[in-house]
């Protein structure tokens, strides 16, 4: 979905925050002991600490003893969390503390603090019977940044659009000679001069685009829209002077009736549909590439939990592709009376069969050391295997086919791997039932 690893890492961060939002929204507490605190990047820790001290004084007057103690406890937890930071991190700080009531009716303390993956320009402090995640949700909605080049006969404008924020990066005007029938014997010379000036103008636009939209050898926008009233935009998109890296990012050519800032606004309006589908298109492209490896039988692919984990262990996986709602759980069990551990990967159906958790020889239950969704384990560990992780949906035709046909887990490999001819060492420790995929 993303051409460079940093964008893929960002997608994983987004998935983690989506998961966090889901669990925070579901949490409920008694009284108003659940604190949501968001500190924007340029704020001071000392100001927030003073505000919390004032709140502590106010909360001491709460009449209900139970509520008073739980609110004071939550404020103290937040104060302890803030002590871990000398200053507010570059992207701001998000803290959630409080006592929640679990499904079994038990009370459980929650303390979460993290720096979001991009600046959060919201200041928030709320005590309530639920956590407030609206600012985090807003952070996810406007993620990708798009570049715009508005080019016509009178000048060029370069801008970006991220969410609802548009920014003009650079603009310049140009004075190109118009076509005319005068000149007599010099008519050809005039035409040649005009073509030369036009050529130089397109070159200047192409060079400026590289300066603005490529940083550190990588394109810094998710896609480019070329807009204009004449055929300059077409000329630019097909020109050899236009950088190949930018050429591959062009999403759409848009016809507009104005130049400059008005043209920029019109270009944004006319390309909204394309921009909203970018993630969708990237996903189709990624899974399409995966299917190509399979149809050409290159051997540079894997699917299903067992093969994918083998390939990861070998360091062969370049791109690990996992369905966002993959329902496979990863269990680490310790066999009773020994230090030996075994790892199981089970679907909800398989989890119902308790024999997986019982030692066949002794009939005793294994000790559960760790259990978490497999996707979460991948999100925490994929870098150790030298892979990039792409989390996909089933909303596109390709995505749906990937989930139904390949179990929602697979990978594009760096080199050919023969899984059938390979005896997996320690394979007895793992449990897979491939009938379920």
UniProtKB/Swiss-Prot annotation:
Disulfide bonds: none annotated. It comes from the Eukaryota. GO terms for cellular component: cytoplasm. The keyword Cytoplasm applies. GO terms for molecular function: translation release factor activity; translation termination factor activity. Keywords: Cytoplasm, Nonsense-mediated mRNA decay, Protein biosynthesis. PANTHER family: PEPTIDE CHAIN RELEASE FACTOR SUBUNIT 1 (PTHR10113). Component of the eRF1-eRF3-GTP ternary complex, composed of ETF1/ERF1 and eRF3 (GSPT1/ERF3A or GSPT2/ERF3B) and GTP. NCBIfam families: aRF1_eRF1. This is Eukaryotic peptide chain release factor subunit 1. It comes from Xenopus tropicalis (Western clawed frog). The lineage of its organism: Eukaryota, Metazoa, Chordata, Craniata, Vertebrata.
